[in-house]
Design a protein with these regions (language model features):
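Autoinhibitory propeptides
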Residues: 2-8, 15, 21-23, 30-151, ...
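Structural recognition of the beta-strand scaffold that forms the well-ordered cores
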Residues: 14, 105, 175-178, 232, ...
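Surface-exposed intrinsically disordered loops and tails
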Residues: 53-67, 120-147, 203-220, 286-289, ...
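Extracellular S/T/G-rich loop segment that most often corresponds to the catalytic His/Ser-adjacent loop
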Residues: 180, 340-423
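Substrate-binding/access-modulating region of protease and related hydrolase catalytic domains
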Residues: 237, 262-347, 358, 395-412
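C-terminal subdomain of the subtilisin-like protease fold in secreted/lumenal serine endopeptidases
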Residues: 294-301, 307, 423-571
Length: 572
């Protein structure tokens, strides 16, 4: 999950611009792209293209929401990322644009950890998180349950089957945005309504914008089919399947009744472009405030902190969209054992993993993929669902496997539960302010969650946050309005910047925000830096001066720190 790795490709940047006065021009006006290109070229940055995100015209006059959608300009340069640090390009661009309200960040390719290990029986490389095993044993023998069954829907686990049956006669239309690698055009698990939905979008460069299907192309750093697997768990078709404990003849999807809007944000779950996720989040928010409300968003990917992601999450929250995002995966704590972004943001539900025996999705066995969790101070908005060894729609054989794994599998279970709750309390929720709907849904899921953990040295909060999903019990929690609005999300603030820059509100200064975002990405990407500030287990404002001094020196010496940030820190 290294968010700063370079791939010998041109540097892309995301330009965000606020305005000094109401009514002043930002970057959304006609001709802005050309102006940006000229300014960057004049500063010595060769530009390939500048593009502003498309704006959706209002589909309904009924919408009275005033949620502000972030104004972003996505710029492709001709500078190679191995020649110049992308953050240095971002700083040069900010200076060239000559606007104190401009924020620029690199449009990094984010790595999302999945599992590749040798399958002893087949002697082949295995992407376990996709359920692509090539032998007669469908489940992963390293984890329970040790049989091929559809178990996660049952009352002893997520309770999704009972919960959805309770609301099946309710005719309220629930929409779920599904952000992933798209869907298979041929797999039987994908509902026809998903394939026909005209609201589907593709945010992968060079692919048709209105077609979110996954062409399932193999190749270097490509892992096709991930979106089909998560979609099956979220809203998959009815299937008739022989299992070790009998015949399963029911819907695989926890929220099969929902209208699903697929957004293809990556050609592979292994690599995710920062801008693609930001654009997809903003697209879903635009739909909502334009009269086509999206109630829940399921995201089984993520990476390093990004300002564009934070702003997109804030806009979605204010529009009333409940976001469920994967907490991430790791191998024995690498690249990080802690929850990734955007799942770590306070306005997002972080989907962690719990095994079928209520144990943490954690192991000390070498080379074994497991789920991210913690630090505890960032688990207040987290929730766990079941993984691994749950049914997975595999595109390799166009079938159902029983070794679905990773927090990618937990995410759609929680999203389905959120959709079920919204379906039951549709009228009551719609009477609330949009952000209150998010808080009411989350309150029900958190309050009803099972507060337990088995065979673990720490409390359930450490691994599961608010507990383990209990979808049917959540329906017993009435809609509440007495919850405080969650503060706006942003990259964690580094106090050393406040001491360097004497300003009444340093966090509002774009250039400092840029330094701060780079620091956050460095800490996220490099464990040796994270360890210097207590591996993020303590709040930054409680870390002593000596440790901050050591941290600053290490950042200045680090090869992946931008020259601009190094110079700034040295001046301290």
């Amino acid at each position: 999950m290294n968010g700063m790795k370079r791939y010998n490709q041109p540097v892309d940047i995301i330009i965000q611009q606020t305005t000094a006065k109401p009514g002043a021009k930002g970057i959304a006006y006609a001709g802005a792209a050309k102006t940006i290109e000229k300014q960057l070229e004049a500063a010595g940055i060769p530009v390939h293209s500048v593009r502003r995100a498309a704006v959706i015209s209002s589909a309904s006059s009924k919408s009275k929401q005033k949620t502000a959608i972030p104004e972003n300009a996505y710029t492709k340069t001709k500078i190679n990322d191995t020649e110049v640090n992308p953050w240095d390009v971002a700083h040069i661009a900010r200076t060239a644009l000559n606007n104190p309200h401009t924020f620029v960040e690199p449009d990094f390719l984010q790595e999302f950890t999945i599992n590749r290990k040798v399958n002893p029986e087949a002697g082949k490389t295995d992407a376990k998180s996709f359920g692509n095993r090539n032998n007669d044993i469908n489940y992963d023998k390293d984890w329970p349950p040790h049989q091929n069954t559809v178990w996660h829907l049952d009352d002893a686990y997520s309770q999704l089957k009972s919960a959805r049956e309770l609301v099946q006669d309710n005719d309220a239309l629930i929409r779920i945005a599904h952000l992933d690698t798209g869907y298979s055009a041929t797999h039987f698990i994908v509902p026809g309504s998903v394939k026909k939905n005209k609201l589907q979008r593709n945010f992968v460069d060079g692919e048709p914008v209105n077609d979110a299907h996954d062409p399932l192309k193999d190749g270097f750093l490509k892992m096709p089919g991930h979106g089909t697997g998560t979609l099956g768990i979220l809203a998959g078709n009815k299937i008739n399947l022989h299992t070790d404990n009998g015949q399963f003849n029911d819907y695989l999807g926890g929220a099969w009744f929902a209208e699903v809007i697929c957004c293809r944000i990556a050609s592979s779950v292994v690599l995710l472009k920062t801008s693609a996720l930001a654009e997809a989040l903003n697209y879903v928010t635009q739909l909502t405030i334009s009269g086509t409300p999206v109630h829940v968003l399921s995201l089984s990917m993520g990476g390093a902190p990004s300002a564009a992601w934070a702003k997109a999450v804030n806009a979605a929250y204010n529009a009333g969209i409940t976001i469920i995002a994967a907490a991430g995966n790791n191998f024995n704590g690498l690249p990080t054992r802690h929850v990734i972004y955007p799942a770590r943001f306070g306005r997002v539900v972080a989907a962690c993993g719990a095994t079928c025996n209520m144990e943490p999705y954690f192991t000390l066995k070498p080379g074994e993929m497991q789920g991210c969790f913690g630090p505890k101070r960032h688990m207040k908005k987290a929730l766990a669902a079941f993984t691994p060894n749950i049914p997975w729609a595999s595109t390799a054989g166009n079938n159902i496997r029983f070794d679905g794994a990773g927090t990618s599998c937990a995410t759609p279970q929680i999203a389905a539960a959120a959709a079920i709750y919204y379906k039951k309390y549709f009228d009551q929720l719609n009477k609330l302010q949009p952000w209150q709907r998010v808080e009411a849904v989350r309150h029900a899921l958190y309050t009803s969650a099972k507060k337990t953990v088995e065979h673990a040295p720490l409390s359930y909060q450490q691994y599961f946050g608010n507990g383990i999903l209990q979808a049917n019990d959540a329906l017993e929690i009435p809609v509440t309005t007495g919850i405080t609005k969650t503060p706006e999300d942003h990259a964690p603030w580094f106090p050393i910047l406040s001491t360097i820059f004497k300003n009444k509100n340093p966090q509002s200064v774009p250039v400092l925000q840029m330094y701060n975002t780079e620091l956050a990405q460095l800490v996220y990407s490099y464990p040796e830096l994270s360890k210097l500030i207590d591996d993020e287990n303590r709040s930054y404002d409680k870390i002593g001066v000596r440790k901050w001094k050591q941290f600053k020196e290490a950042v200045v010496a680090h090869p992946d720190t931008s020259v601009t940030l190094k110079k700034f820190l040295v001046k301290m």
